[in-house]
Amino acid sequence: SRPELDAKRVGCMGISGGGTVTTFAAAVEPRIKVAFVSGYLNTFLDSILSLSHCIDNYVPDILNWCEMYDVAGLIAPRPLFIESGDKDNIFPIEASVESYKRVKKVYETIGSPELVQQEVFDGEHSFWGKQGLPFCAKHLKA
């Protein structure tokens, strides 16, 4: 820990590969208080395993254990914001929306549906931030 940081206000955000890192890091690191995943939440079958990706996207035999939305569900009960471009050619929007619904069910089950949100924006595989940045600011407010 670092004395100049407020441990109650640590967030993590990233797009694409950064969304991968954010998802997995927030799933296992409880010191991350808010996660903002851009251009990543989907299914492994519809995205990572359907195209040729860089090697750091592959977790051997992961489908024997879980799907991408299962990993994202481990972030609960901490706030999670997900954004997806409706024309993303790497992470198809249909699978992103379906995966979000599955993550939302986790938050509903624990009684905190307001702590997870998704924004689908008009765009490709890019960062948007219009609703996500205010969401993070709200949940990291001192």
Question: Where are the model-predicted features located?
Answer:
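Alpha/beta-hydrolase-fold catalytic nucleophile elbow
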Residues: 13, 38-39, 83, 121
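Short glycine-enriched nucleophile-adjacent loop
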Residues: 1, 19-30, 136
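Short, conserved active-site loop motifs that form the nucleotide-linked donor/cofactor pocket
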Residues: 10, 80, 115-117
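Gly/Ser-rich "nucleophile elbow"/oxyanion-hole loop immediately N-terminal to the catalytic nucleophile
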Residues: 1-16, 32
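Short, glycine-/Ser/Thr-/acidic-enriched flexible segments
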Residues: 18, 42, 87-88, 124-125
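Conserved strand-to-loop "acid loop" that flanks and positions the catalytic carboxylate
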Residues: 76-91, 121-123
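C-terminal catalytic histidine-bearing segment of alpha/beta-hydrolase fold enzymes
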Residues: 101-142
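Mobile cap/lid helix-loop segments that gate and shape the active-site cleft of serine hydrolases
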Residues: 32-72, 77, 90-100, 108-112
